[in-house]
Every structure is written in C-alpha cells, then in structure tokens.
C-alpha cells in the first residue's frame, strides 16, 4: 500500500515572505515571525519608499531644468506638454548643435545669444502669420501676405547658426541690419517720429521684432535704427490717407476739393520708395494711393473696392 504523496508543505508558503537576515526571528513551530521583525520589515519598506520618492524628485527637477535651458524645449513650454523622452531628445539635439558650432557654445555667450535670437525671430514670424490669418477681408491667397511670409521665412533661414561659420556669427544691434535687401541709404537716427496711423499699420512688422529684445537699451537702439530704415515708407504712408472715409470727408468739407488730392499726389510722386520690401499696408501703399487719387471723382465705396481688389 502506497503512502499518499503530499505535494504541499507547511513551509512552502512562508519561505517567500522571509527576507535575508531574518531567519533567526522565524519560528518553525508556529510558522510566524516575531513582532520585532515585522516592525523592521515595515520600517525598511518605508525607508525604501522615501528613497525612491527622492530619486524621482531629483529626476523631475533635472528634467525641468533641461526644459528651461534648452531653447527648443523652452519654446514649447506653454503650447504643449512635453514628455521626458522628448526633453532628453531635445537636449541631445542641442548638444549636437553646440558641437557643430565648433565647440564654442559651451563657453561663448555670443553663440548662445545668436541661438536665442534665431528662436525669437521665428516666434515673431509665427505671430505675423497668426495676425495675417486673423485679419478680416484678407484672403489666404493674398500675394502681399504670401510675399511677406516667404520673405520672413527666408530671413529666418539666413539666421540659422548651423549655416554659418562659428567665427562669423552676426549679432548686430538691430535684426533687419543683417538683411541686405532691406538696407537703404537714409539720414541719421534723428528722423521724424512715428505717426499714429503708421504705428498702427506697421505694428505686425516693427513691434514683433522690437519685442524680441529683452533689454530696454537694445529696444531703444532698435527704434532709432527702424526710423532710418523705414523712413521712406513712413513718409509715403503719412502723406496718403489711411482710410477711404478720410478722403471723402476732405472733399465734402473743403470748398476746393480738387486741390487736396492734387497736392497729395504730387508729394507722393516726389518721394519715390527707396526700399525693395513693401509693408503689408494695402490702404497706404504708393501704387494703391496713386490709382485711388487719379479717380478722385469716384465715391468712397468705389475707392475701397479698387484698393480691396489690389
């Protein structure tokens, strides 16, 4: 007669719960552990949890510092939530960028300033694109808006540090000075200040670039240089009416209504534009103003329709 084989043993269920170094406190008769050993196990688990929490806090703090220091991660700080793997990948890309710049990025503050300047310029380009898309009555296939966005994108690609040698990194006091197609021979910085209409019309272009400078000294230098570069465009905007109703009111209230458009047209013809880039101001552009002033007998509605078609 065979003895029934018992596959279970009383010690098999409790062996897995015994930690290393706790064999002395284990009682083989009762199959339980003493109260002192149980409290030690709980204390060890608590200490392990505290150590793990501190380790996670250090990792999260280091990732937050990387997100603040890396320009590409800092750009997406308010737009979307970055994962830890994305922050690490952006850090690796930024280190590769510094190596590609000749290794001077670790110690050269000028190279880092160029990097942040490029980032700010691209952010301003995005603001201009959002502003153009929010304008009412402007179609998406507008040629002037498309030329403006294409021009700004080309300028942003020229500012990329990877495309330039480390020894010739430009850092002028005004961003538009690095663009050869926008430089023009103008009088000194003590030019006429901005008129209210011109400040409102040129806000998508001048203000976005001025805000890219953190210090007030650079902003003041930017304003003076902007007056020298955009002086011909501002004179043409100041001499031409900015809204269609302004010309119509002048023709109604002045007894000599024909002399007002003629003086405006003569002054606009005497000061030709000296820059190749035309701001996105359809109502104040010289070509649109000449066509509108040539037909002064038309109504204000027909004048606005012609400018809108341009």
UniProtKB/Swiss-Prot annotation:
Sequence ranges of Low complexity compositional bias: 182-192, 261-273
Primary localisation category: nucleus
Q: Where is the Orange domain?
A: 116-152
Query: Is Transcription tagged as a keyword?
Result: yes
Do you know which Pfam families this protein is assigned to? Hairy_orange, HLH
Q: Where is the protein situated, by its record's location annotation?
A: Nucleus
Annotated ranges, domain bHLH: 43-98
- Annotated GO CC locations: nucleus
Return the similarity comment: Belongs to the HEY family.
What is the name of the protein in this document?
Hairy/enhancer-of-split related with YRPW motif-like protein
Q: Which organism is it from?
A: Danio rerio (Zebrafish)
């Amino acid at each position: 007669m065979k003895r029934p084989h018992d596959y279970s043993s009383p010690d098999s269920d409790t062996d897995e719960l015994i930690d290393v170094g706790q064999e002395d406190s284990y009682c083989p008769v009762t199959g339980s552990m003493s109260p002192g050993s149980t409290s030690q196990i709980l204390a060890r688990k608590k200490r392990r949890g505290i150590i793990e929490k501190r380790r996670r806090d250090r990792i999260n703090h280091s990732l937050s510092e990387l997100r603040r220091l890396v320009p590409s991660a800092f750009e997406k700080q308010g737009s979307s939530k970055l994962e830890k793997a994305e922050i690490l990948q952006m850090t690796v890309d930024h280190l590769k960028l510094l190596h590609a710049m000749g290794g001077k990025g670790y110690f050269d503050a000028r190279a880092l300033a160029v990097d942040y300047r490029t980032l700010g310029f691209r952010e301003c380009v995005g603001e201009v694109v959002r502003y153009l898309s929010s304008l009412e009555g402007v179609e998406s296939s507008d040629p002037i808006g498309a030329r403006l966005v294409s021009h700004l994108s080309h300028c942003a690609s020229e500012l990329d540090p990877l495309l330039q040698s480390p020894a010739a990194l430009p850092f002028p006091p005004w961003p538009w000075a690095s663009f050869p197609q926008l430089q023009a021979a103008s009088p000194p910085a003590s030019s006429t200040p901005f008129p209210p209409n011109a400040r409102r019309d040129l806000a998508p272009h001048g203000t976005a670039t001025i805000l890219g400078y953190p210090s007030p000294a650079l902003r003041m230098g930017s304003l003076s240089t902007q007056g020298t570069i955009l002086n011909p465009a501002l004179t043409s905007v100041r001499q031409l009416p900015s809204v269609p109703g302004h010309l119509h009111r002048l023709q109604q209230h002045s007894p000599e209504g024909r002399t007002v458009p003629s003086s405006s047209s003569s002054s606009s013809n005497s000061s030709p534009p000296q820059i190749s880039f035309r701001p996105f101001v359809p109502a104040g552009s010289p070509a649109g103003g000449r066509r509108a002033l040539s037909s002064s007998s038309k109504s204000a509605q027909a004048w606005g329709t012609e400018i809108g078609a341009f």
